[in-house]
Amino acid sequence: MSKPFYVRFEVPPELAEKAYEALRKARESGGKIKKGTNETTKAVDKGLAKLVLIAEDVDPPEIVAHLPLLCEEKKIPYVYVPSKKKLGEAAGIEVQAAAAAIIDPGAAKDLVEEIIKEVEQIKAKAGL
């Protein structure tokens, strides 16, 4: 199955796993996260997000299609993850999440920085 139109670069599975882990770790260590498209959009709009996670299996894709562009505009790093179900679990909710944002990484600070560096390298190779 091809990727939805809003996915601008390929994220390796191990990087996606790191992103889930960073979200989980930030939440569990007293950091601050936002869950869901609306909260994530507001956090990006206000420039509060340190890292945005966007699920690739969102239907309809228009729900999150604005997020990569908004993140680019606000210079906020973002990463794609394959599953909205796993994203919801990592965010600590019992439902799926199309998107999430790490506001304060807490104990996941180093992991978040590592993810941002990897994403920047992937985007540079993709010419973005």
From Swiss-Prot:
GO biological process: ribosome biogenesis; translation; tRNA 5'-leader removal
Pfam families named in the record: Ribosomal_L7Ae
Recorded GO CC terms: cytoplasm; ribonucleoprotein complex; ribosome
Protein localization: Cytoplasm
Repeat listed as a keyword: no
PANTHER family from the UniProt entry: RIBOSOMAL PROTEIN L7AE FAMILY MEMBER
HAMAP family: Ribosomal_eL8
UniProt record similarity statement: Belongs to the eukaryotic ribosomal protein eL8 family.
Complex and partners: Part of the 50S ribosomal subunit. Probably part of the RNase P complex.
Function: Multifunctional RNA-binding protein that recognizes the K-turn motif in ribosomal RNA, the RNA component of RNase P, box H/ACA, box C/D and box C'/D' sRNAs.
Protein's name in the database: Large ribosomal subunit protein eL8
